[in-house]
């Protein structure tokens, strides 16, 4: 049920209420019985003959009817207590919000501030702070227990099927276990193969994990600009994106009220929030890259660390010596962050301050456990530029920086392209694994062709499914508005659903143990003509039912054994069902007549012909109408039985 509630004019409206025939459930890990790990249970119809299906859920408390949502107050900050219990942190006053943090916006255009204030935490001394440091010391945190329970989707009871799925897939070197334990999570993080993006100041977070040996995740980008959108719209877009399955959200705001927008989003977000700090730093120096300084950038990092941003995209691999490699490209440097740093390097003829101060950036981010998302500022912006020397030179540098960040105790993932034709995708994954020590890969698509403006969610979804199969851990969505404009609410949903399809297809191909459970449930519902179950098991129940209802709108059609594609006469599944039922009900003498010894093909043919004849007679007897009353169909079925 989609309810956009706005009880007063100062509170952003967000979507609450559960999805059709679903309820929020909570799993309790044996290792930490005080934790409540959210799942969504899809409730199947009474005649389904199978249990309800638990699935991964990113929607937070917004779909839990027992929780009262107050966007002004923000979400519960249960995780803050976990951080404090571990020790090694201090609470402090933090920096004051400065006018330039919000673009020096005037009073007439200033957004309403988030009123609740929480003193920030930061790490002190040499005690472990980051999930990587805990993992390296052999310590299992509550976050690790939480994500292990979340990834399993209640499949402990279905290990036999899980092992069969593993055997059937092609994982390209990934090692997904049949059942995920907290120790497995710890080991993957300790090896640098997975991250839990979880700033110690994001107390509202429901922890999740990014790594190729886990479910493939997706990210949704939101954010205002200098010409469009507002704080209210961006908070609503965040809630809307996670409703449909976004595992993380990046706030790429570039206009007014950047700090305020981010605060509202963070205080109301149960998923990790990422940013590109150079965007805000640029706003603080009037949009002129030449005026950027290390001191200004560092202050911006501290500002965002204190707010609770979980991961930063930092384009530290855009080095002065690589910029000339883009000169002969068709589309040059298309990354906004990459172009900002390239201009700074050329204007000052110096090495990037992101590269020269990388050690200091690591020390700062470690104090708050902000994860690195090492940006691909030289990614190809057209398939003509894919896999060129500029792209791979930067990737090699990102590998070097990954090792530095690990040595400093930081969590790291690597960003990737971009625009890459299908036959050049796998080499990107292979090279990233080699150069970056198997750190998680996070790609924008890639887009597999450049000919479809307005449909780039499809061109990129193809590449995303492929690279996800090859081992990419998180896929950044592309909406239909890519290259054309800022996505609205509907574009966000289309982008998220498209990328959920790509991620799920990748998990199926890898042989992820839990992936096919949902596919099989949909298939059984489809074969049994359980229309409502088929809608509700899908990624987008509302759209599925709307498409069905365009041609068969009545409630009676929800039990009809056909759809508008074939009609009642030509439904292959209905005919198959009738053949099965008919053959099962034959007596021995009837079977002998239809199944002569040594003539298996003839016997099957006889059953089919007889079944077809009965269906033909039944159709004529009921008036040869394309659409039939459900009650009459039921009566006819009783007469045949």
Swiss-Prot record:
Keywords assigned by UniProt, alphabetized: 4Fe-4S, Iron, Iron-sulfur, Lyase, Metal-binding, S-adenosyl-L-methionine, Thiamine biosynthesis, Zinc
Coiled coil: none
GO MF entries: 4 iron, 4 sulfur cluster binding; carbon-carbon lyase activity; zinc ion binding
Residue positions binding Zn(2+): 419, 483
Ranges of Polar residues composition bias in the record: 1-13
EC numbers on record: 4.1.99.17
Disulfide bonds, paired cysteine numbers: none
Uppermost EC category: lyase
Pathway this chain belongs to: Cofactor biosynthesis; thiamine diphosphate biosynthesis
Cofactor note: Binds 1 [4Fe-4S] cluster per subunit. The cluster is coordinated with 3 cysteines and an exchangeable S-adenosyl-L-methionine.
Binding, substrate: 221, 250, 279, 315, 335-337, 376-379, 415, 442
Pfam families referenced in this protein's UniProt entry, alphabetically: ThiC-associated, ThiC_Rad_SAM
GO biological process: thiamine biosynthetic process; thiamine diphosphate biosynthetic process
Sequence similarity: Belongs to the ThiC family.
Cross-referenced PANTHER family: PHOSPHOMETHYLPYRIMIDINE SYNTHASE, CHLOROPLASTIC, THIAMINE BIOSYNTHESIS PROTEIN THIC
Protein name: Phosphomethylpyrimidine synthase
Organism per entry: Rhodopseudomonas palustris (strain BisB5)
High-level lineage: Bacteria, Pseudomonadati, Pseudomonadota, Alphaproteobacteria, Hyphomicrobiales
């Amino acid at each position: 049920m989609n309810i956009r509630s706005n009880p007063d004019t100062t509170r952003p409206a967000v979507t609450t209420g559960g999805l059709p025939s679903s309820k929020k459930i909570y799993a309790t890990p044996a290792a930490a019985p005080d934790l409540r790990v959210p799942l969504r249970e899809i409730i199947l119809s009474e005649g389904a003959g199978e249990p309800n299906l638990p699935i991964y859920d990113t929607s937070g408390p917004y779909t839990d009817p027992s929780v009262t949502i107050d966007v002004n107050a923000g979400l519960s900050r249960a995780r803050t207590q976990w951080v404090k219990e571990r020790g090694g942190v201090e609470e402090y006053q933090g920096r004051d919000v400065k006018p330039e943090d919000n673009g020096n916006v005037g009073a007439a255009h200033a957004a309403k501030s988030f009123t609740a204030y929480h003193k920030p935490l930061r790490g002190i001394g040499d005690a472990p702070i980051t999930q990587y440091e805990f993992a390296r010391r052999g310590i299992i945190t509550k976050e690790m227990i939480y994500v292990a329970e979340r990834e399993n989707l209640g499949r402990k009871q279905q290990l036999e099927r899980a092992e069969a799925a593993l055997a059937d897939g092609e994982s390209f070197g990934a090692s997904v276990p049949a059942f995920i334990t907290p120790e497995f999570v710890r080991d993957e993080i300790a090896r640098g193969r997975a991250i839990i993006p979880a700033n110690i100041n994001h107390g509202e977070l429901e922890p999740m994990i990014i790594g190729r040996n886990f479910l493939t995740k997706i990210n949704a980008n939101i954010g205002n600009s200098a010409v469009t959108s507002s704080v209210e719209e961006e908070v609503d877009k965040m809630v809307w994106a996670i409703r449909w399955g976004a595992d993380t959200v990046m706030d790429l705001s570039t206009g007014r009220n950047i700090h305020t927008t981010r605060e509202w989003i963070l205080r109301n977000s149960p998923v990790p929030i990422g940013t590109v700090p150079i965007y805000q730093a640029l706003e603080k120096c009037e949009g002129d890259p030449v005026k950027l300084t290390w001191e200004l950038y560092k202050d911006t990092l501290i500002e965002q660390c204190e707010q609770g941003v979980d991961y930063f995209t930092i384009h530290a691999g855009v080095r002065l010596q690589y910029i000339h490699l883009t000169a002969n490209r068709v589309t040059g440097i298309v990354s906004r962050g990459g172009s900002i740093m390239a201009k700074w390097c050329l204007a000052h003829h110096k090495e990037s301050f992101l590269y020269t101060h990388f050690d200091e950036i690591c020390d700062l981010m470690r104090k708050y456990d902000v994860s690195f998302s090492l940006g691909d500022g030289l990614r190809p912006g057209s398939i003509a530029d894919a896999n060129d020397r500029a792209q791979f030179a930067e990737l090699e540098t990102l590998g070097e920086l990954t090792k530095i960040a690990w040595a400093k105790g930081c969590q790291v993932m690597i960003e990737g392209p971009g625009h890459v034709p299908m036959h050049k995708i796998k080499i990107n994954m292979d090279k990233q694994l080699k150069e970056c020590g198997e750190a998680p890969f996070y790609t924008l698509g890639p887009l597999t062709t450049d000919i479809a403006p307005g449909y780039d969610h499809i061109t990129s979804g193809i590449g995303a499914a492929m690279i996800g199969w090859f081992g990419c851990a998180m896929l950044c969505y592309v909406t239909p508005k890519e290259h054309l404009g800022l996505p609205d609410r509907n574009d966000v949903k289309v982008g998220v659903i498209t990328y959920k399809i790509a991620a799920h297809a990748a998990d199926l191909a890898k042989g992820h143990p839990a992936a096919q459970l949902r596919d099989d449930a949909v298939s059984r519902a489809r074969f049994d003509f359980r229309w409502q179950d088929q809608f509700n098991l899908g990624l987008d129940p509302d759209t599925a039912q709307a498409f069905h209802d365009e041609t068969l709108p009545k409630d009676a059609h929800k039990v009809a054994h056909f759809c508008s594609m074939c009609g009642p006469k030509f439904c292959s599944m209905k005919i198959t069902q009738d053949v099965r039922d008919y053959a099962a009900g034959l007596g021995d003498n009837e079977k002998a007549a239809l199944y002569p010894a040594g003539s298996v093909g003839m016997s099957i043919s006889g059953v089919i012909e007889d079944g077809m004849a009965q269906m033909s007679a039944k159709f004529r007897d009921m008036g040869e109408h394309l659409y039939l009353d459900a009650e009459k169909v039921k009566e006819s079925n009783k007469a045949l039985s």
